[in-house]
């Protein structure tokens, strides 16, 4: 009798959680925040990301890439735009499974309730301060649950790869770029 009761409780909890997630997903899909001023980000030819994703990446980039982006305002804007474009190209090249996981992560970070309670950021991403974003990233990097640590690692590693794969970043690290055919004697 005890096992049957535990099983029933488990099934009820699973059903309630499933319905809750379905409701949150539906609400989120209807209320994805659009950037307050998309013109500030420039024009993107996005293949996999949407405007809200571009805003999120543009907000995270200066914090994750702190100290590596150009300081001049125009050059910094170009660099962040390049990171957003590279992130989009990278997502387009991932397997459908990994792309789906990134999409789920972005959905959680876009929805105001999960952004506030899971990320600790109450404001939309384009209004959040760098200090708020840094605190969120630090919490997830050091979180006791591996799921949050993994999400942080995915965001950070993709962002870093997108920046350092760009020739705009090479001058600051004195990297001359990869060897080409002539340099290799081909």
What are these regions (language model features)?
Residues 1-21:
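N-terminal secretory signal peptides and thylakoid transit peptides that target proteins
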Residues 2, 42, 56-59, 71-186:
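Mature-region segments of soluble proteins
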Residues 3-4, 21-59:
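C-terminal segment of N-terminal export signals and the immediately downstream linker at the start
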Residues 9, 14, 52-55, 150:
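Generic recognition of stable, solvent-exposed alpha-helical segments in well-folded globular domains
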Residues 64-67, 71:
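Secondary-structure edge/capping motif, primarily at the C-terminal ends of alpha-helices
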């Amino acid at each position: 009798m005890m096992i049957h009761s535990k099983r029933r409780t488990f099934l009820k909890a699973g059903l309630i959680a499933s319905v809750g997630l379905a409701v949150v997903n539906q609400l989120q899909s209807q209320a994805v925040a659009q950037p307050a001023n998309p013109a500030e980000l420039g024009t993107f030819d996005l293949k996999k990301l949407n405007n809200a994703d571009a805003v999120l990446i543009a907000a995270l980039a200066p914090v994750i890439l702190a100290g590596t982006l150009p300081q001049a305002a125009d050059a910094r804007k170009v660099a962040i735009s390049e990171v957003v474009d590279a992130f989009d190209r990278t997502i387009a090249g991932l397997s459908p499974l990994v792309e789906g996981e990134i999409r789920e992560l972005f959905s959680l970070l876009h929805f105001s309730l999960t952004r506030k309670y899971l990320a600790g950021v109450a404001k939309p991403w384009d209004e959040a301060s760098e200090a708020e974003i840094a605190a969120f990233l630090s919490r997830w990097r050091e979180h006791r649950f591996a799921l949050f640590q993994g999400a942080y690692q995915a965001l950070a590693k993709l962002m870093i790869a997108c920046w350092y794969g760009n020739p705009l970043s090479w001058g600051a690290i004195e990297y001359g770029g990869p060897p080409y055919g002539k340099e290799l004697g081909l």
